[in-house]
Amino acid sequence: VLGAAFFAIPNIACKIIGILLLFLWFIMDCSDGEVARYTQTFSRYGKEIDYLAHILDHPCVNLSMWYTYVQISTYNIYIISALFITLISAELITRNLIIMEVYDKDKKAKNDKVFKPSWMKWLFLQIVYFPNIVLFLPIIILGDYVGLYNSSYILAFIVAANLLNTANMYRKTLKKCYKAL
């Protein structure tokens, strides 16, 4: 949340500090689960806190990126707002679908096949899953903020890819639910 707050401040130094704090958040977010797995100390409380942190952090980061686009004042605020509302909504739906799938897998046997996507699917998933967006989109927006290029096309592509991924996940979830009936 602190990284998002710094990124929202209309100052280039604050935006760079915000990006660095977002990278630090990402490292800490990844490492807490790894430490739990390594030490074999899992708790339901830890999972819930991690989930709650994502529910709070992700919209805050999206709002800070949206506010930076508003500060650029080159783009139509309604289109940018619609893109970010769509991105936040798709991300929250995706997060809930992932959690539903994780809880469903916890109930099943552990000897199921491991999903290994093709390299193109893997690359697509890296682009659309939110923590990865936090790593590259603020840097791209920063380039737009200082006037190097127009990043709205990249934003539109990311939103479209997120919508496709969310729709696909939702379709698969519905298919599983109807098969269970």
Sequence positions of predicted segments:
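Transmembrane helix-loop junctions in multipass membrane proteins, especially transporters and channels
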Residues: 8-12, 38-42, 66-73, 100-107, ...
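Hydrophobic alpha-helical transmembrane segments
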Residues: 2, 24-33, 74-83, 97-110
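C-terminal membrane-associated helical module and adjoining short loops/tails
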Residues: 95-181
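Membrane-embedded alpha-helical segments that form the functional core of polytopic membrane enzymes
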Residues: 1-45, 148-159
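Multi-pass membrane catalytic core of lipid/isoprenoid biosynthesis enzymes
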Residues: 1-6, 19, 38-95
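Structural signature of transmembrane alpha-helix termini at the membrane-water interface
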Residues: 5-9, 31, 63-70, 90-97, ...
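Hydrophobic alpha-helical transmembrane segments of membrane proteins
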Residues: 10-15, 28-31, 56-58, 62, ...
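Alpha-helical transmembrane segments of multi-pass membrane proteins
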Residues: 22-28, 84-92, 157-165
